[in-house]
């Protein structure tokens, strides 16, 4: 890797500061509890203690009891699924948290994470401080991107 490319990748790593760990997200309730289906063996068992899990999507497993996000088909159609992480962003984040680094994929996913922060700004702009019932769909979405939904 050229030194300029290496510097660019290192800069992306510096800006990536998620507010929630995968374990905390799973405990709070994300992706209708069905994100991993049967693919949890590669992750620490501790992540799944008190996690809200389901074999199929169950909106009641989500922290805000709403469906937030697009379908898997839409993820594929938009080019958001990469062969390294066929389940998408959260799978990448879990593997990243466990130490895996693939610079070109990391850069793509960190850019996507950073761009999602616009939803945090929308909640702050449109909701009274502490009103967790305001914009529940956006709150669920930012939770699924490792941002604190209780802003």
Predicted regions and their residues:
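Compositionally biased, intrinsically disordered low-complexity regions enriched for acidic
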Residues: 1-84, 88, 100, 118-141
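Eukaryote-biased recognition of C-terminal alpha-helical segments
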Residues: 138-146, 150-151
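Hydrophobic transmembrane alpha-helix bundles
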Residues: 96, 126, 145-147
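Short linear, low-complexity motifs centered on an aromatic residue
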Residues: 96-120
């Amino acid at each position: 890797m050229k030194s300029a490319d290496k510097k660019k990748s290192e800069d992306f790593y510096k800006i990536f500061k998620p507010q929630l760990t995968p374990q905390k997200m799973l405990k709070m309730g994300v992706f209708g509890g069905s994100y991993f289906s049967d693919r949890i063996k590669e992750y620490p068992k501790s992540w799944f203690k008190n996690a809200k899990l389901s074999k199929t999507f169950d909106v009641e497993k989500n922290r805000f009891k709403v469906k937030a996000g697009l379908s898997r088909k839409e993820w594929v159609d938009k080019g958001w699924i990469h062969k390294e992480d066929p389940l998408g962003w959260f799978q990448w984040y879990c593997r990243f948290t466990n130490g895996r680094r693939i610079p070109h994929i990391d850069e793509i996913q960190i850019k996507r994470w950073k761009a999602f922060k616009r939803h945090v700004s929308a909640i702050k702009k449109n909701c009274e401080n502490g009103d967790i019932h305001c914009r529940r769909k956006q709150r669920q979405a930012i939770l699924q991107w490792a941002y604190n939904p209780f802003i």
